[in-house]
């Protein structure tokens, strides 16, 4: 018996064939099983003959139209099989040739017979089967599931024999059913460029996707909408400003023009809109400022100056026009000289003094604002002697001081100074370093006019200033309320920072948009030391000003770094504070003295990291403070004791600070409910608040401090029972509810530096709840209600925002994963009060922790304080990465350089000297002076030609231009402490 049935004997094979053929005949009688939607042809039943050959193990079924199969194919298969067996047995080449010819002939006949077979014809039903593939899908070209042998592979190439032409011959165009490059094929098609508008009915509820909208048509519709609204309500200033900003959006669609032309056309459009708006709103100051800014961007300096002069002649009392006229001359490299600018200030003062008789309060404020700007200009040009004489005479005239007041003699011995200069000149330093060191030494020591007898020893005629030289800048202030403002301006000119620096204070003093007046690093210290009751984040804030102190970004005499005149200048500032404060009423006097005590605290904070510790400075300060507090007028002033306690804390005496605060609380009545005087009650609540904040401070915090807070707060109620804490909570809650029920009073800010009673009550209540329950959500809800309630009183709302940020920063420093509320509160506050220094310090720290790719500096509008905070954040990030040796440090450095380039193109802040000085400091720190030093010098001088410190810093960045720098200083008549004769000697010597 064979293993396979195919190789069994013939009888079995024949019987099996008969059975199969009989079965197939019976099955083919019905053709229902062949019914199919794609094959509807009638199929006749046919007789199938299946030949199972013994030569193969496979069953071959072949069909035909008339005769299904014949024995020919099986016969041929038999012959090919036997022939292949015989071929293996033959050894001679002749026999193999004969057999191969015979097999080839058989194969050829078999191919021709298979081609002659008829094919079935049927109707094709291909509806909804085929479609035109118009969208390329690259996934169809990948055959990842097949092995490499199953994938089709084509070699297409052209080969040449002999010479190959240098010019590439174009390949023949293959007529294929697909295109090689669909994009190229679409581009070569002739397109219909005529835009045909189709009228379609769109359902109102149907939302059109963003990629379907026609942006240009949308902008046209929006322009039409603005025009219609402005026609209906031309007095809407906010709508006019939005329409002006909208022109920047339209400029993005003008791609057919150059960038410079687009910018100019946009400014022209804005100018025409502003002029139309001023026709309807002639009294709007904001629109007038925009008009002057746009005029300055499209006109040369000389033409712009003439245009403004024409406007000033029409409206001589308009301070905005006077400021623009002065700035047009001051900011022009060609026109700026010190005498020209001072002549314009003189004319302005004369007109404002004449008009002050009609409305004293208004014109006194304008006169003081212009006086402050004039003093800042004198400081920038280096004319400290002239500046101080102007301040002194104005204070004597308006504060009723003695004629000999504020007169300081022999600040420093001139002979010692000459000896120091000789040591510098004898050193073999480069010429630029010799000049810089001599200039800075004299600049630090000279700020007061010398007498006529000392002039012969000094030899510098510009150091001798008499009252007649500044008589044009000395004017009486008619309204008595303006004396406090004059005192603040006088101290700001001496480089005393505002402590704290709030948005409302800057706005009230007119310093929000005064970008060209910022030239020295002292204004940056409130970023590191805000003085708003902060309890956390001290090291993070101090890291923001890293390198600023070492960079010597100061001007004139300074109180930060050690030099021969540091202590004399500090004594000079203290004496000025005391003289001004003692000549003011009680409330304003307290403001000035609190400001001075905070300034002393700031100096202690900054001196902690000095490499050389001077115990004499601390001892001298303590003796000065004790002498101040021993006076009868100051002995019972709780504000002064609070500030003295905080100075003790900064000196490292924490226990002494707590004892002073507790003693001050217990010195008088400890129950606020029993005090009727508003100021005394405010001072007591502020003591409680300061004590709580000091105990919760993260630098000195202990777990026992919470228990101490709960013990101290019991003093607020007179009853001493077991339920004392509940009574305190009820009392504070009632105070907060009364605040929410009554409308807060919107009054002028006369207390810039004194605490606010409502704010301190809310802070004490929230700190008590936080210590007792540790529930931050409850605290946030209270602040939200209070902030919403006092939205009509901006200075109080800003204080409450600060207090909320303080407690949130404390909480999220302990729980860093949950800072969502902090971020939300921060951005809400910056939207309303963008120039609050405490909020900006938190914002700068968060920016410094971001990677470079996450920082977006494409915003077109910056305030000068926001720009400075971004600079500090970038410096902190770059320094930190450089210390780690991280590759991202260079990306951060490039990002910071790019940020400075953006500032140089922003009209509102590009004239800020301090931004340019920080830019030059960055070049010095990272050895980029050779690449960018000369370029930055030319750009900075073109935008700030009056700022003497720009030239001083440029001598370090671009020392090869020293001679040119010195010549420009003399041409502009800026202050140069090295006389021309000494300068010639230095030039000839080296």
Task: Describe the role of every protein-language-model region.
Residues 1-990:
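Polyampholytic low-complexity alpha-helical segments
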């Amino acid at each position: 018996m064979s293993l396979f049935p195919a190789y069994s004997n013939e009888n079995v094979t024949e019987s099996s064939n008969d059975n199969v053929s009989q079965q197939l005949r019976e099955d083919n009688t019905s053709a229902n099983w062949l019914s199919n939607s794609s094959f509807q042809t009638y199929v006749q039943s046919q007789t199938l003959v299946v030949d199972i050959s013994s030569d193969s193990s496979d069953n071959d079924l072949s069909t035909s139209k008339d005769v299904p199969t014949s024995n020919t194919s099986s016969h041929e298969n038999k012959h090919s099989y036997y022939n292949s067996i015989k071929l293996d047995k033959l050894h001679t080449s002749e026999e193999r040739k004969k057999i191969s010819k015979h097999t080839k002939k058989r194969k050829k006949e078999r191919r021709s017979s298979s081609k002659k077979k008829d094919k079935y014809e049927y109707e094709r039903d291909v509806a909804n089967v085929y479609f035109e593939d118009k969208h390329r899908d690259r996934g169809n070209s990948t055959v990842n599931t097949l092995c490499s042998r199953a994938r089709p592979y084509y070699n297409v190439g052209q080969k040449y024999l002999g010479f190959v032409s240098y010019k590439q011959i174009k390949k023949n165009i293959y007529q294929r059913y697909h295109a090689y490059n669909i994009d190229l094929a679409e581009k070569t098609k002739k397109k219909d460029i005529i835009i045909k508008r189709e009228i379609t009915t769109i359902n109102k509820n149907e939302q059109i996707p963003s990629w379907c909208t026609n942006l240009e048509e949308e902008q046209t519709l929006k322009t039409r909408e603005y025009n219609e609204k402005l026609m209906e309500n031309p007095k809407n200033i906010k709508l006019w400003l939005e329409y002006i900003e909208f022109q920047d959006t339209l400029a993005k669609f003008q791609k057919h023009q150059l960038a410079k032309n687009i910018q100019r056309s946009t400014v022209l459009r804005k100018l025409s809109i502003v002029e139309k708006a001023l026709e309807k709103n002639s009294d709007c100051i904001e629109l007038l400022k925009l008009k002057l800014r746009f005029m300055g961007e499209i006109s040369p300096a000389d033409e712009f100056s003439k245009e403004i002069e024409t406007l000033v002649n029409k409206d001589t009392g308009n301070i905005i026009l006077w400021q623009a006229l002065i700035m047009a001359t001051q900011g022009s490299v060609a026109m700026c000289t010190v005498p020209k600018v001072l002549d314009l200030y003189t004319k302005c003062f004369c007109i404002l003094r004449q008009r002050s008789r009609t409305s004293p309060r208004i014109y006194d404020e304008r006169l003081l604002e212009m006086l402050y700007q004039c003093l800042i200009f004198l400081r920038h040009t280096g004319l400290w002697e002239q500046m101080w004489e102007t301040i002194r005479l104005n204070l004597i005239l308006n504060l009723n001081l003695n004629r000999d007041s504020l007169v300081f003699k022999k600040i420093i011995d001139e002979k010692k100074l000459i000896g120091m200069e000789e040591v510098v000149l004898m050193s073999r330093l480069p010429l630029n370093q010799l000049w810089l060191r001599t200039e800075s030494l004299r600049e630090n020591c000279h700020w007061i006019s010398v007498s006529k007898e000392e002039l012969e020893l000094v030899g510098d005629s510009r150091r001798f200033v008499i009252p007649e030289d500044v008589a044009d800048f000395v004017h009486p202030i008619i309204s008595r309320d303006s004396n406090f403002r004059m005192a603040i301006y006088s101290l700001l000119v001496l480089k005393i920072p505002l402590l704290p620096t709030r948005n409302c204070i800057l706005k009230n003093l007119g310093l929000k948009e005064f970008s060209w007046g910022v030239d020295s690093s002292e204004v940056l210290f409130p970023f590191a030391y805000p003085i708003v009751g902060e309890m956390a984040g001290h090291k993070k804030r101090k890291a923001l000003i890293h390198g600023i102190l070492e960079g010597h970004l100061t001007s004139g005499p300074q109180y930060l770094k050690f030099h021969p005149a540091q202590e004399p200048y500090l004594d000079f500032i203290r004496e000025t504070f005391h003289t001004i404060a003692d000549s003011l009423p009680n409330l304003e006097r307290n403001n000035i003295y609190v400001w001075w005590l905070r300034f002393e605290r700031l100096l202690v904070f900054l001196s902690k990291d000095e490499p050389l510790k001077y115990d004499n400075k601390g001892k001298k300060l303590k003796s000065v403070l004790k002498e101040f507090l021993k006076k009868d007028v100051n002995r019972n002033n709780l504000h002064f004791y609070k500030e003295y306690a905080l100075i003790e804390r900064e000196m490292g005496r924490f226990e002494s600070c707590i004892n002073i605060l507790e003693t001050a609380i217990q010195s008088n009545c400890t129950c606020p409910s029993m005090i009727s005087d508003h100021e005394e009650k405010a001072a007591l609540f502020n003591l409680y608040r300061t004590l709580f904040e000091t105990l919760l401070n993260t630098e000195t915090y202990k777990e026992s401090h919470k228990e101490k807070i709960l013990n101290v707060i019991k003093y607020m109620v007179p009853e001493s029972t077991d339920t004392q804490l509940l009574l305190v909570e009820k009392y504070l809650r009632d105070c907060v509810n009364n605040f929410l029920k009554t409308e807060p009073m919107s009054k002028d800010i006369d207390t810039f530096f004194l605490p606010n009673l409502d704010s301190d009550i809310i802070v004490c209540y929230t700190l008590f709840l936080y210590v007792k329950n540790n529930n931050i959500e409850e605290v946030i809800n209270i602040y939200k209600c209070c902030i919403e309630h006092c939205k009509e009183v901006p200075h109080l709302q800003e204080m409450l925002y600060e207090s909320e940020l303080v407690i949130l920063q404390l909480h999220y420093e302990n729980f860093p994963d949950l800072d969502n509320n902090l971020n939300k509160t921060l951005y809400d506050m910056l939207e309303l009060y963008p120039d609050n220094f405490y909020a900006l310090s938190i914002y700068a720290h968060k920016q410094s922790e971001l990677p470079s790719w996450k920082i977006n500096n494409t915003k077109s509008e910056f305030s000068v304080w926001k720009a400075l905070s971004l600079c500090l954040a970038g410096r902190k990030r770059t320094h930190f990465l450089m210390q780690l040796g991280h590759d991202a440090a260079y990306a951060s450095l490039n990002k910071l350089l790019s940020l400075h380039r953006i500032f140089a193109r922003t009209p509102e802040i590009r004239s800020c000297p301090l931004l340019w000085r920080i830019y030059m400091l960055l070049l010095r720190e990272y050895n980029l002076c050779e690449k960018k030093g000369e370029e930055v010098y030319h750009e900075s001088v073109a935008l700030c030609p009056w700022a003497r410190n720009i030239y001083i810093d440029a001598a370090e960045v671009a020392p090869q231009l020293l001679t040119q720098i010195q010549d420009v200083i003399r041409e502009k008549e800026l202050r140069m402490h090295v006389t021309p004769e000494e300068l010639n000697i230095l030039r000839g010597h080296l």
